Structure formats: structure tokens, C-alpha cells
Amino acid sequence: MCGIYGITEKNPQIIKNIISKCSYRGPNGSSIYSSEQVTLGHNLLSITSKPDEGKQPWKSINENVLVYNGEIFNYNELLVRFRDKFYPKSTCDTELLSWLLDQYSYEEVIQNIIDSMHSFVFYNKKKNEIVLSRDHAGIKPLFFANTKTGIIFSSEIKGLIN
């Protein structure tokens, strides 16, 4: 049960506070990505990969950034399907999801490629676009709220409460 958090502004202190409040969601580490447009944070609970492989926020080769909590059930099948295009450096499904989101539209990835339980936030730096997503059943929660300056989001509702 990882934790993902963010705000659509440069404000690392708010995300540090949320990470601290929700630290039990990920005892294997936490980290933050911050730009002028977005600040993303992550608490890591490593289950299927080594803790150093799953460190997030995950920055892709295209400079896009992903924070993710979940499991891709068809991970091994997708490794075979994309073996001529995707060359993983880890055993972490975060790396695969990041690559897929770099290559295909969000809708294509969610509707036609992955079979998963998830919540994630993907920041496309080039397009200056942020996508928030959770599985249709809400197994991996993602809460959000409007603020005076944008949107704040968290794996737990208490991350949104001051």
C-alpha cells in the first residue's frame, strides 16, 4: 500500500507534510519531485520489486513523471507483447506503466492495454498536462480537492485536510 500525493503548484512543503502524515503507507522510503507546475510525492511499500527499483516519483526518458500505487496483473504478458520495444532496467511495474504512458494515450493504456488495480498521477512535462487515474472499482483510492491555486490530491483523504 504505497501512498501518492501531489499539488498543481511548486510547493514541496505541503507534500512533505502529507508524506509525513501518511508515512505508514510506505516504510521503504519517500521522495518528492517538484517543478513550477506540479509537486508530486510518494511513500514506497515495495512488494513485487526491490525497494531501490521502485523508487518514485518515476521520471521517464521523456522527462515525464509518474507516481503510482497498484499492480499490473498482466505485467508478464505485456513484457512479452512489447519485448521488441520495451527494454526494462528493473522488475518494477512502475517502469512499464511509465513507458506505456509515454508511448500511448492515457485512454489506450487504461482501456486496452493494462489489467490492473491502480491509482496514479502522470505529469506530461512537454504537454504540461496532468492525468489522475484510479481503477474503476476504487480499490486503490485517490482523493482530490480544488484549492485557490489548483488541485491537491492524495491516496488518503486525511492528506487533503490541514
Positions of PLM-derived features:
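Cysteine-centered catalytic environments shared across enzyme families
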Residues: M1-N162
